[in-house]
Swiss-Prot record:
This is UDP-N-acetylmuramoyl-tripeptide--D-alanyl-D-alanine ligase. InterPro entries: Mur-like_cat_sf, Mur_ligase_C, Mur_ligase_C_dom_sf, Mur_ligase_cen, Mur_ligase_N, MurCDEF_CellWall_CoF430Synth, MurE/MurF_N, UDP-N-AcMur_synth. Pathway: Cell wall biogenesis; peptidoglycan biosynthesis. Keywords: ATP-binding, Cell cycle, Cell division, Cell shape, Cell wall biogenesis/degradation, Cytoplasm, Ligase, Nucleotide-binding, Peptidoglycan synthesis. Its EC number is 6.3.2.10. Transmembrane segments: none annotated. GO terms for molecular function: ATP binding; UDP-N-acetylmuramoyl-tripeptide-D-alanyl-D-alanine ligase activity; UDP-N-acetylmuramoylalanyl-D-glutamyl-2,6-diaminopimelate-D-alanyl-D-alanine ligase activity. It comes from Buchnera aphidicola subsp. Baizongia pistaciae (strain Bp). It is found in: Cytoplasm.
Length: 460
């Protein structure tokens, strides 16, 4: 982080500073900022955030006892002679203002990524490429909201060459807020699918929300979009920049893929670009990951990263936990853990992947959440898709996923995880060659069932 003194912090946040000795203020320099008292370090500013179900002002005493140098609060909690305090109207907004100021102090190329799915994968792929070219920072895990994005920006310093940020949204204006803090040099929309419909109401609502990312794009910035996705023509109309690049799995775009071959180890394909062509090996399953790789490659190509570096970055990707993560129990028995997230598009992708694997195929489905008033219909659509596939059997758990089992006509619904686990274990033990793919929204916690299943299998 770039250090800031308290006078400057007060100015940035439009706050009121309370301190027992104003003469020493210029000598008090903040070297780190946290919203978590477990991460208090010397010369640290503690920001007390307030949410729907919490108020971090209750942890101010702990922050002081652990050695925080100053506090940023919405209400003065202690006499000013205890510790310097900056009082603001809204600590979450103040956090964003500080992050925006820090972003402006660096010359890093800032890349912002959004989309209905694949944001984290594209972020990780882009990071894997760019870290070979300079000091790179990226969003930790999927902390992509109005708090997570500023917290990532706080870690920027003048040594960073690249910053890769994931921008998520549940409602309109969410991305407009984070992109205006981020002020990206490059902004990318990966795709538009039916997701978070409780907040966006329709696919068009999703598209409108995602295109907000371009509102923060810097002058002469680069806009990138997936030509295979919905509503891309509307994004293009609203762009102010002239630097627009598209990518596609098909041959109708600036950057595209050809000669695609897939296996249960990943895929191989050729990337075509204005800078040349190159074959790439990707150690991830699914056509959607080829599209994600093209997104990352397009970002890199837009800033003239050599194709060989792109090839190295994509081929050396780390395993992405809970995202089509392959777990081989032995030569014949495999679990594919895809419990990171779920919407209709990613469910269909998972079904297609399982279809192309030999042996007995068992699809385990949990609920897809935040799909709005048509959520039952979307679960039935997934069930119908499985019915028309070569998948042998479906296990489901959750309030909505029962519709998947019913519509598939080859499903069994379970009302508790113990019964599901017991039946999964029996399938693993009794089928000679079997692949079990587990898919659900993250909050359904089917990743826990995957971990338990692995343990139970090895005990048997």
């Amino acid at each position: 982080m770039i250090s800031i003194n308290l006078i400057k912090l007060t100015s940035i946040t439009n706050g009121i500073l309370y301190c027992s000795n104003y003469a020493t203020l210029h000598s008090i320099s903040i070297h780190s900022i946290t919203t978590d008292t477990r991460k208090i370090t010397p010369k640290c500013l503690f920001i007390a955030l307030i949410g729907k179900n919490f108020d971090a002002h209750m942890f101010v005493n702990e922050a002081i006892s652990k050695g925080a140098a100053a506090l940023l609060l919405e209400k003065q909690c202690y006499p000013k002679n205890v510790i310097p305090q900056i009082i603001v109207q809204n600590t979450t907004i103040a956090l964003g203002k500080i992050a925006s100021w820090i972003r402006d102090q660096t010359n890093a190329t800032v890349i912002a990524i959004t989309g209905s799915s694949g944001k984290t994968s594209v972020k990780e792929m882009t990071s894997s490429i760019l870290k070979n070219c300079g000091n790179t920072i990226s969003t930790f895990q999927n902390l992509n909201n109005n708090i997570g994005v500023p917290l990532t920006l706080l870690n920027l310093n003048k040594s960073h060459k690249y910053a890769i940020l994931e921008l998520g949204a549940n409602y309109p204006k969410d991305i407009e807020y984070t992109t205006k803090i981020t002020k990206p040099n490059i902004a990318l929309i990966n795709n538009i699918y039916h997701s978070h419909l409780a907040g966006f109401k329709s696919l068009f609502g999703v598209a409108q929300a995602k295109q907000e990312i371009f509102l923060g794009l810097r002058k002469n910035g680069i806009a990138i979009y997936n030509k295979d996705s919905n509503y891309w023509s509307k994004w293009k109309k609203n762009l102010l920049t002239q630097k627009i690049i598209n990518f596609s799995i098909k041959k109708n775009s600036t950057i595209f893929a050809s000669n695609i071959t897939t296996s249960n180890q990943g895929s191989k394909f050729k990337i075509h670009s204005p800078n040349g062509e190159i074959y790439v090996t990707l150690p991830l399953l699914g056509y959607h990951n080829i599209s994600n790789a093209l997104a990352a490659a397009t970002i890199a190509i837009s800033i003239n990263i050599p194709l060989e570096i792109i090839k190295i970055g994509l081929s050396s990707l780390p395993i992405l936990k809970n995202r089509l993560q392959i777990i081989r129990l032995n030569k014949y028995k495999t679990i594919i853990n895809d419990t990171y997230n779920a919407n209709t598009a990613s469910m269909i992708v998972a079904i297609k992947i399982l279809e192309n694997i030999s042996g007995y195929k068992l699809f385990v489905a949990g609920d897809m959440l935040e799909l709005g008033k048509n959520d039952v219909l979307y679960h039935k659509i997934i069930g119908n898709t499985i019915y028309n596939s070569n998948i042998n059997e479906v296990f489901s758990i959750g309030k909505l996923s029962k519709e998947i089992s019913i519509a598939s006509k080859k499903g069994h619904h379970f009302y508790n995880s113990d019964e599901l686990l017991k039946n999964l274990k029996n399938k693993l033990l009794n089928k000679k060659i079997i692949t079990i793919l587990v898919k659900a929204s993250r909050s359904e916690k089917l990743d826990v069932i995957v971990e338990q299943l692995i343990k139970e299998y090895h005990k048997a």
